Amino acid sequence: IYKVYQRMQAHFPQIGNVKITFKKNIPFGAGLGGGSSDAAHMAIALNEIFQLGLTKEQLAEEVRPLGADCPFFVYNTPCYAEGIGDKLMPISLDLSGLRLVMIKPHCGVSTKEAYGGIIPKGTSKVLNNLKDLKVLNVLNDLTILSTLTNDFEETVCKVHPEIAEIKQRLLDAGAV
């Protein structure tokens, strides 16, 4: 949060002193982008408070150097991501008929640990077609959603097998 403040104050001298009260409800090490969302929302708040008039694209550029996934939280909507997760295209995804269950085991996975085990495999056929799926508006089809994969899963589950066990139990219970 402070890095965002410093960075934006350097770019926009009209940003004055601020008093920040911060309450965090996102668990650490859960892969939910807590620090990145904090950075993005600090930039959004400074933009509003000091009436900077920055677009989402400009705000995304401001926070991009602080973390590859920071721009995602500026958009605050499901997105198709390319590159290192910083090139974004908003997509329509209706999950209104589904229940979301979040389970945070005792183990935690740092961003460095998660990214450290990823071996680029090239773009999958599903990912090549994801932009087309957006156009066809079929991303809400559960059979399509079930074909998407999480690139972090293999690495994280090797280090923390309890995560693989939790996932399997959810799938056995009918999760998508």
Regions found by a protein language model. Give the residues of each.
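Phosphate-handling active-site elements
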Residues: A10-K19, A45-P65
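DPxDG-like acidic metal-binding loop motif
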Residues: A30-K56, F72
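N-terminal lobe of the biotin/lipoate ligase/transferase fold
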Residues: Y2-I15, F22-I26
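Short pre-catalytic strand/loop immediately N-terminal to key active-site residues, enriched for Gly-Thr
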Residues: V18-G31, V176
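Glycine/threonine-rich beta-strand-loop-alpha-helix active-site module
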Residues: Q51-I91
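Conserved, helical-rich catalytic subdomain that frames metal- and/or nucleotide-binding sites
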Residues: Y75-N76, Y80-V176
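A generic structural signal for short beta-strands and their flanking turns/coil linkers
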Residues: G16-V18, A68, T77, R99
